[in-house]
């Protein structure tokens, strides 16, 4: 019986899950938009949202906690220098999960995970039109 067991197993052992979500959060912070399967996207919220909440208060202790979970100095820097101030007035709900169909090989449901309020990339056609 699986009473009081929270979180998805995703057919991985605990160390593999931990490493996978550490890498996924790092990619999300770096690129602000990633594509993954829907169950992984839903589980990613449990790892990413507390880190963004942590980054709202920039202190040495919070940076060390974030580094302990991410193990990437540049990602921690972006988390505290850009994302923390961006979501200062937002009480939660930093991620948006958008379903985007099914994967070609195995029909797994896919989803985009993006940070809410991320700056829109400037299209190359717009840049050339201005010149």
From Swiss-Prot:
It holds the Pfam family Ribosomal_L17. This is Large ribosomal subunit protein bL17. The lineage of its organism: Bacteria, Pseudomonadati, Pseudomonadota, Gammaproteobacteria, Cellvibrionales. GO terms for biological process: translation. GO terms for molecular function: structural constituent of ribosome. It comes from Teredinibacter turnerae (strain ATCC 39867 / T7901). InterPro entries: Ribosomal_bL17, Ribosomal_bL17_CS, Ribosomal_bL17_sf. GO terms for cellular component: cytosolic large ribosomal subunit. Keywords: Ribonucleoprotein, Ribosomal protein. Belongs to the bacterial ribosomal protein bL17 family. Part of the 50S ribosomal subunit. Contacts protein L32.
């Amino acid at each position: 019986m699986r009473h009081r067991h929270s979180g998805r197993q995703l057919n991985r052992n605990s160390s593999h899950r931990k490493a996978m979500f550490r890498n996924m959060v790092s990619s999300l912070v770096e690129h602000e938009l990633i594509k993954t399967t829907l169950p992984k996207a839903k589980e990613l919220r449990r790892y990413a949202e507390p880190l963004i909440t942590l980054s709202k208060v920039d202190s040495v202790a919070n940076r060390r906690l974030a580094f302990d979970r991410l193990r990437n100095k540049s990602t921690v820097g972006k988390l505290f220098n850009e994302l923390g101030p961006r979501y200062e007035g937002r009480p939660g709900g930093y991620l948006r999960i958008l379903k985007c169909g099914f994967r070609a090989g195995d029909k797994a449901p896919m989803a985009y995970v993006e940070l809410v309020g991320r700056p829109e990339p400037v299209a190359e056609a717009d840049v050339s039109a201005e010149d």
